[in-house]
């Protein structure tokens, strides 16, 4: 599985995650179910937002629909390849496939960071400036903000992919990870990676730290505003719409910070931590938003219990 130093690699072998061989089938079935339920859950969110006129024109739920698209996409570029680790035989990933996987993961992941920030800002405007909210956050503005998040995410993903794969890869081709990510791939480079590691740390650090700081600042203002609400029902509804977002942000940011914002150690915990944003978070997001968001729950009930009659269409 090693190439001589004068030969550039044309494929990589992803070693996957370590597991007992006797549990091969169990792990395959587990991640297969995770993948299917992720797609179905996020598709249900998309259909609910699109079908309910009370939701699909509101910026908060436009953002939620985009989040579902991102979750479905991240799961699709990571989990099927991970499942191949639990089948017999070695299945290399082509060099171009590795480039594409790294690009799309960082493109979608950074877009998700920006989107979480937009969702926090939207909640800040809705709760702290409710009278001006319809003017400050219009459907047109939310669409422009989403387009900006996609564009910034694409630039971030392209930067990371170009910096990583401009280096020569001519030695071992085993990526000690379950997908092509920057730290694992850089270990195979036949050149000094100091600049790459520094740029990666700064770039991802700026994205994560700036987005998280803006989210934190928004929620400090939101909590102060909620505590000033006089009615218990008003406070409950405000916490209901914000609680789901706080939960998914926490679940997403903690493992990302653990993986990228610490010195390179090649810890066996990296793989376990990376499973959270790549497989677990996309699976949990629909559950969190349907269980903790009262408006989504009510929209689901309306859609499931009250199908439209021909006269209503």
Curated annotation (Swiss-Prot):
Keyword Magnesium assigned: no
Transmembrane intervals: 26-46, 55-76, 101-121, 141-161, 199-218, 239-259, 271-291
Keyword Mitochondrion: no
Domain of life: Eukaryota
Molecular function GO labels: G protein-coupled receptor activity; olfactory receptor activity
Segments on the Extracellular side according to the record's topology features: 1-25, 77-100, 162-198, 260-270
Glycosylation sites: 5, 85
Organism whose genome encodes this protein: Homo sapiens
GO annotation terms (biological process): detection of chemical stimulus involved in sensory perception of smell
A Pfam family the protein falls into: 7tm_4
Coiled coil: none
Main location: membrane
Function: Odorant receptor.
Cytoplasmic side: 47-54, 122-140, 219-238, 292-313
GO terms for cellular component: plasma membrane
Protein name: Olfactory receptor 10G3
Similarity comment text for this entry: Belongs to the G-protein coupled receptor 1 family.
Membrane topology: Multi-pass membrane protein
Keywords in alphabetical order: Cell membrane, Disulfide bond, G-protein coupled receptor, Glycoprotein, Membrane, Olfaction, Receptor, Sensory transduction, Transducer, Transmembrane, Transmembrane helix
Database matches in PANTHER family: OLFACTORY RECEPTOR (PTHR26453)
Cysteines paired by S-S bonds: 98-190
Compartments (UniProt record): Cell membrane
């Amino acid at each position: 599985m090693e190439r001589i130093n004068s030969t550039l690699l044309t494929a990589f072998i992803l070693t996957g995650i370590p597991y007992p061989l006797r549990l091969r089938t169990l792990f395959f079935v587990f991640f297969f179910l995770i993948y299917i339920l992720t797609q179905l859950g996020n598709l249900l969110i998309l259909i609910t937002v699109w079908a309910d006129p009370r939701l699909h024109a509101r910026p908060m739920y436009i953002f939620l629909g985009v989040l579902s698209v991102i979750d479905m996409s991240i799961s699709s570029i990571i989990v099927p390849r991970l499942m191949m680790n639990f089948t017999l035989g070695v299945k290399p990933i082509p060099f171009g496939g590795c480039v594409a996987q790294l690009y799309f993961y960082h493109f979608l992941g950074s877009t998700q960071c920006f989107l979480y920030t937009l969702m926090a800002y939207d909640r800040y405007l809705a709760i702290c400036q409710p009278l001006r909210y319809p003017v400050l956050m219009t459907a047109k503005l939310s669409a422009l903000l989403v387009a900006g998040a996609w564009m910034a995410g694409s630039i971030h993903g392209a930067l990371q992919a170009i910096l990583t794969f401009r280096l020569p890869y001519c030695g071992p081709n085993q990526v000690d990870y379950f997908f092509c990510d920057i730290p694992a791939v850089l270990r195979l480079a036949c050149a000094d990676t100091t600049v790459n590691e520094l740029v990666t740390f700064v770039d991802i650090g700026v994205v994560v730290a700036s987005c998280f700081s803006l989210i934190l600042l928004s929620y400090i203002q939101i909590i102060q505003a909620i505590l000033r609400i006089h009615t218990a029902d008003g406070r409950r509804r405000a916490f209901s719409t914000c609680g789901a977002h706080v939960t998914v942000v926490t679940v997403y940011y903690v493992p990302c910070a653990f993986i990228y914002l610490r010195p390179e150690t090649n810890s066996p915990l990296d793989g376990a931590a990376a499973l959270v944003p790549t497989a677990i978070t996309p699976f949990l997001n629909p559950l969190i938003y349907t269980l903790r968001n009262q408006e989504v729950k009510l929209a689901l009930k309306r859609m499931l219990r009250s199908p439209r009659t021909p006269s209503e269409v």
